[in-house]
Design a protein with these regions (language model features):
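Secretory targeting signatures
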Residues: 1-32
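Short Pro/Gly-enriched coil loops immediately N-terminal to beta-strands
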Residues: 105-106, 110-125, 136, 228-233
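Exported/periplasmic ABC-transporter solute-binding proteins
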Residues: 24-62, 67, 76, 95, ...
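Short beta-strand-centered segments that line the small-molecule binding cleft or hinge
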Residues: 79-94, 98-113
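Structural motif
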Residues: 16-19, 82, 248
């Protein structure tokens, strides 16, 4: 066999191998695709209640190459963290702070996600005499008038902002009064604040989800006032603005947001906690005009 014939045969064999190999290439699977990380910062309550982790897990199950990581902090601290540019999406519950965040160009828009409500809690013997009242402003006035021990988070969290709104509506400035205590560890969240209030047999304003998740551990306090519209607690999404915060993953955040407001995610919210606590911890609020 001469060299030219040998070379031709070799070329033909390589061509056949190339064709066969091309037919055997498998489609990329989850382990070979690039991974995307979405970073969010959330108000503490929905994280501690398990709601945010449940939503994250459901989304990551559908999108195995997406990793969602979260920080938790009070709304004020969450917003401050987002301004540093390390957060793609915030989940918060203080309308005035949210609107300012967007107005300052750090967030693109406020998007309703879910809601629950706040309640006024206090000791069983109720020295302020507010049990059964449905007017939160009138109830908190009675606490102040009788100089009864009241515990505040005092950290500009959404819970603290709501509390301040109620005091303002009542025409009362509680700071500086001996009966008004700012819990020194309030920034750690509603759970620790509620348990401290229980130890002190005092009054406080608390979100219902925290109450339900901690109810079994409470010895001295319970819900005394509920049902006032002023106590509604709207939890909203704000994507961070890529024009101001250039390192944020806006597309990834918006893909997650679009799923969070979908029927699938809203159904998860609707049923979360129902089996364990006998009632849901949060209610769906996507596409609502009230938030």
């Amino acid at each position: 066999m001469n060299l030219k014939k040998t070379a031709l045969i070799a070329v033909c064999l390589l061509a056949v191998v190339a064709v066969l190999s091309a037919g055997c290439v498998s489609s990329p699977d989850a382990s070979t695709l690039p991974r995307e990380t979405i970073t969010l910062s959330s108000t503490i309550g929905p994280v501690d209640a398990g709601m945010i982790p449940a939503l994250e897990d459901a989304y990551m199950e559908k999108h195995p190459n997406v990793v969602i990581r979260h920080y938790k902090a009070g709304t004020g601290a969450t917003i401050d963290m987002a301004k540093s540019g390390i957060i793609d999406l915030v989940i918060v519950h203080a309308k005035a702070l949210e609107e300012q965040f967007v107005a300052d160009g750090y967030g693109t828009e406020r998007i309703p996600l879910m809601y629950n409500d706040f309640v006024i809690m206090g000791p069983a013997d109720d020295p302020a005499g507010i049990k059964g009242m449905t007017d939160a402003t009138a109830a908190i006035k009675k606490i102040a008038e009788k100089n009864i021990h009241f515990i505040s988070r005092g950290d500009m969290s959404g819970t603290h902002v709501k509390e301040l709104d109620v005091w303002k509506a009542a025409g009362i400035t509680p700071e500086g009064n001996k009966w008004y205590e700012v819990y020194e560890k309030g920034a750690t969240g509603n759970g620790p604040t509620l348990m401290y209030t229980d130890e002190q047999k005092a009054y406080t304003i608390m979100d219902r989800a925290t109450y339900l998740t901690k109810k079994a551990n409470l010895k001295n306090i319970g819900i005394l006032v509920e049902g006032d519209e002023v106590l509604l607690n709207f939890i909203n999404l704000i994507p961070c603005n890529p024009e101001k915060l250039t390192k944020v993953d806006y597309d990834g955040a918006m893909a997650f947001v679009e799923w969070l407001v979908s029927d699938e995610a809203q159904e998860i919210i609707k049923n979360f906690g129902l089996e364990q606590y006998g009632e849901p911890l949060f209610f769906p609020n996507a596409n609502s005009a009230v938030f």
